Regions:
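Amphipathic alpha-helical repeat scaffolds of TPR domains
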Residues: 611-624, 650
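Structural signature of tandem alpha-helical TPR/SEL1-like repeats
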Residues: 628-640, 661-674, 681-686, 693-708, ...
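Membrane-embedded alpha-helical bundles that constitute the cytochrome b-like, heme-associated redox core
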Residues: 1-147
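Primarily the internal scaffold of c-type cytochrome electron-transfer domains
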Residues: 121-125, 138-168, 186-220, 237-543, ...
Length: 725
């Protein structure tokens, strides 16, 4: 028992140290290995001791010490088998330590009068914890990483913590995360994501880079690489000639390059992040039995891994912003600063983020990027929370990549399609004008006569989208509104936005996109933003907003019978020109109908009995008209909203918006009074009253009101700007 006492006291010393010390430095991890190894030695020695007791007739468990030492071993073995994962892991480690302490105390009580030397030795061994703390302090800064050359990432703003390159082998180990038994589900999800195919394994991106390098300074590609090719950039593989066929060129955005980000330098985007070398356990780059030992060490003591790989910044919108907010400047375009795609600011200044007081619509609680694009998935992966993990499919709208021969994945296509069709956007046949008479909102059936010119209004509203629609590269993405009329035989007799024989969209269609021009006035059609100098138009829709599209149709003579008017909001990831330019063997990319509406044309009068629910349709139309500065139509619409649903405070708020634009401040104030009566302490009321006070020159009152809004919406940029002015 004395020998067992010394051995378990030794284990207790290292165990206590491992329990109370923050897991940093290589010494700590080697001590874990020592603790586990000596634990198995103790298991063998203890088993032999119990066997001897059993043979002598004493029984296996004959004392308190035997019970406690058995529990110590049992909890230790369970911890080794299951890992220190989650609440169960922490409970096992705690019980393992408590039972060991109990054994020591019970033994000291038993031997205190008979063996003073034992106590002195015990105290000495406990003091060993202090020595271990000192050694850990000395070696805390020691690392098993290799110091590389200083970085040159320009024009990318990426930085590393050390200012040196990082070995590619340290940040290109996604497969290890998935095959070590820790994160197989997350790894499988990542394999079916655009992050996996962000680099030169993406033919659309590779073709874009090929064109860039043939028409601009070759170092410009580093500006792209901070987000598309982090392994190559961070390891210095973009110095000199780039090997597009290397393993690293096919790596995409790996686990380590995303989770290795320690901070976001500011909110300018373009990959303006700081990345650190991942924490290294012993034998991180080994194979065979040493690799198994490495995996065991991470499982038994994952705190260092967890603390380094999951930081608070990783759950913030700013984390996604760093690569989903883009600008170009002279180093990229030899021209001037231009704003590229920008999902972050659109989200930040919207009701979705909870920041914008004046938003038309907002969810019941604020949402971040991760809520929509990293929804919870059922998983038993290590580190799961109640059986769920954040999804690493990064659900979005890219159905092009999983349609390619080398990456064909019907499951991915279906998942993206389901995501796009999940209440992201709405299409509504709102109204029709016949011979100067306007009828709205339309019900399921309308009356039209031959030889009549009609104007049909279609409202498109963003609903479940936290940024502008479309997001991403608006020059190559292809969402459009397809409107067509079918007769009783299903034949199309009128159409806008239909496809021709080569799958090009009718160019008279209404597209939700941006048309970018180069210095010659030519369209940017090769994903060549470095040649972009100006934007012809941008038809994107802000989050929680709406657009109205007008169609005219001359109904010919002799047309009678029943018809259907159908409107589809279609989305194709890349327009046909991009597909034909970039793919050696062009394919037909999927076209997803995100939303649709249908109205039947019959020969009896429309039912004009409106329901309260129709108020939202009218409101959406008013929003679209207000965005087009058609104030008369907007005012009429919002007035109807207040008449149809007088309890809807936003109806009066929106009416006040129109009156303020018209300079009718008395009417606006009156509308705000109604809104305040319906919804007391409504921040929108204070904001628009502040606008009125400012326009009337009552600056003290305006300041008071804008400050009032700041208390509930401190991040609202528009309110802050109004206050500053």
């Amino acid at each position: 028992m004395t020998h067992l006492f010394y051995l378990i006291l030794s284990q207790l010393s290292t165990g206590a140290f491992l329990r109370i010390v923050t897991p940093t430095g290589i010494f700590f991890h080697y001590l874990v290995l020592f603790h586990v190894t000596s634990g198995f030695l103790f298991l063998g020695f203890g088993s032999f001791h119990l066997f001897r007791k059993y043979k002598s007739g004493e029984g296996l468990i004959s004392s308190v010490q035997d019970s406690l030492i058995s529990l110590t071993v049992l909890f230790g073995v369970f911890t080794f088998l299951t890992g220190r994962i989650g609440n169960l892991g922490e409970i096992l480690v705690t019980l393992h330590l408590v039972s060991a302490i109990g054994f020591i105390l019970a033994t000291l009580v038993q031997y205190q009068t008979r063996n003073k030397k034992l106590i002195r030795h015990g105290i000495g061994l406990i003091l060993a914890v202090g020595v271990l703390l000192g050694v850990n302090k000395i070696y805390n800064s020691k690392s098993i990483t290799i110091e590389n050359d200083k970085t040159d990432f320009f024009p990318s703003p990426v930085k590393t913590e050390t200012g040196h390159y990082i070995n590619a082998s340290a940040i290109d180990r996604s497969q290890r995360c998935g095959t070590s038994g820790c994160h197989p589900d997350i790894y499988a999800q990542w394999q079916q994501s655009v992050h996996r195919l962000s680099s030169f394994n993406n033919p659309f991106y590779k073709s874009s880079v090929d064109y860039l390098m043939s028409t601009a300074d070759s170092t410009t590609v580093r500006w792209c690489a901070g987000c598309h090719d982090p392994v190559m950039l961070l390891s210095g593989m973009m110095e000199g000639k780039i090997d597009f066929n290397s393993h690293e060129a096919q790596s995409g955005i790996t686990c380590e390059t995303c989770h290795g980000i320690t901070s976001i330098q500011d909110i300018t985007g373009n990959g303006n992040y700081v990345l650190d070398h991942p924490v290294e356990y012993p034998f991180s780059h080994s194979s065979g039995i040493l690799q198994k030992i490495n995996q065991m060490l991470i499982k038994v003591e994952p705190r260092a891994h967890r603390q380094k790989m999951l930081l608070p910044v990783h759950s913030e919108g700013e984390f996604c912003m760093t690569c989903h907010k883009v600008s170009l400047d002279k180093p990229q375009n030899n021209y001037r600063w231009l704003r590229g795609q920008n999902e972050y600011d659109a989200w930040h200044h919207s009701g979705v983020s909870g920041n914008a007081v004046a938003s038309f619509y907002a969810p019941t609680s604020p949402l971040k990027c991760q809520n929509c694009h990293m929804g919870l998935e059922v998983s038993n992966d290590k580190g799961n929370d109640a059986g769920k993990v954040r999804g690493h499919f990064f659900n979005a709208v890219n159905t092009a990549l999983p349609s390619l021969k080398d990456h064909l994945n019907p499951e991915w296509i279906k998942r993206s399609t389901d995501f796009m069709q999940d209440e992201k956007i709405a299409v509504d046949f709102y109204g029709v004008e016949i011979d100067g008479n306007y009828t709205s909102p339309l019900q399921d059936k309308i009356t039209l006569q031959p030889s009549t010119k009609v104007r049909i209004d279609v409202v498109v509203r963003t609903k479940g989208i936290g940024h502008k629609f479309p997001g991403g590269t608006i020059d190559s993405n292809e969402p459009w509104l397809q409107v067509f009329v079918q007769n009783e035989n299903g034949e199309t007799i009128y159409g806008s936005g239909l496809l021709d024989g080569k799958k090009f969209v009718d160019q008279s269609a209404h597209f939700f996109r941006g048309i970018l021009l180069d210095k010659h006035g030519e369209f940017i059609l090769k994903r060549n933003p470095h040649e972009w100098v100006t934007t012809l138009y941008n038809n994107s829709i802000p989050p929680g907003s709406a657009e109205v599209i007008h169609y005219e149709w001359d109904i010919p003579d002799g047309v009678n019978g029943g018809f259907k008017i159908i409107a589809n909001l279609n989305y194709r990831k890349f327009n046909r020109s991009i597909t034909e330019t970039f793919l050696d063997e062009p394919i037909y990319l999927p076209i997803v109908t995100m939303a649709s509406d249908t109205v039947t044309i019959v020969v009896h009068s429309q039912n004009s009995n409106l329901k309260v629910e129709d108020a939202i349709r009218i409101n959406d139309y008013g929003i679209g008209m207000l965005r087009q500065n058609n104030l008369e139509a907007a005012r009429t619409a919002f007035t109807r909203v207040t008449e149809l649903n007088p309890k809807y405070a936003d109806g009066y708020i929106n009416l006040a918006r129109v009156h303020i634009k018209e300079g009718k401040f008395d009417l606006a104030s009156q509308a705000l009074l109604f809104a305040e009566f319906i919804k007391p302490k409504f921040p929108k009321v204070a904001f628009f009253r502040g606008l009125i006070a400012k326009k009337l020159g009552n600056y003290p009152k305006a300041i008071q009101l804008f400050e009032q809004v700041r208390k509930t919406h401190p991040e609202d940029r528009i309110n802050i700007n109004e206050l500053g002015q």
